[in-house]
Amino acid sequence: MKIYGEIAKVRETVKAWKAQDLTVGFVPTMGYLHEGHKSLIDAARKENDRVVVSIFVNPMQFGPKEDLASYPRDLDKDAKLCEAAGVDVIFHPEPEEMYTPQFCSYVDMNGLTTELCGKTRPTHFRGVQTVVLKLFHIVTPDRAYFGQKDAQQLAVIKRMVTDLNVDVQIIGCPIIREEDGLAKSSRNTYLNAEERKAALVLSRSLKLGKELVAKGEKSAEAVKKVITEEIEKEPLAKIDYVEVVDFDTITPTETIGKSVLVAIAVYIGKTRLIDNFIVEA
């Protein structure tokens, strides 16, 4: 396994692979890798001849009061996980490699980025889309893998790839959870013992919503109500949003039907956590 910080090195390596007709799978990450990331790498390893993982804490997707400086980083640990999982190349650039002082081009999107996380993080998705498009141009993968935990991000990337004719297949992979149900996240490390216990309210409330849908409930308001009431029982929890939206367009819907995303964002203490489930039929 190689670790490169230079765009030119990655391009040179991928070009050599493609000259041999080898397929390339790509997993973009911000590092501090966990089992959720490993599941994406495993999927990429299974479906491609070569696998590239990027580790880049992208400053552009953090707001002015967000946790860029404190976002957890551990390249040695990440490299061990990647090597054990069969990754061929880690791309770990410095911000200066990705963004020159003259940088002024951005990917923006209407609609999909204004709801859910976009409401309280208005510049977040512009940063995500811009860096992901840059990474696609650098790595030129056949397939790229994203987790369903960041469901809005997955929808946004799919739309960007379609709208801008990017020649890459986007693969969404299931949420990976701890044994007690908490969705795996790098930000879980911010939680103290009491907050970690309180954070279970996210998966617990979504389970109630899912059970209601399974019984045939079609009212989005009814589903939101049962989820909200459960979260409000937890003193350490503060709701950012509880929403039911069309998964493809991220627009609010009043009726539970096919391809509907039930998504929540909740502050546990100072840590903002997200979770969701998708109604497939």
Segments from the language model and where they lie:
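Nucleotidyltransferase catalytic core that binds NTPs
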Residues: K2-L236, V245, T249
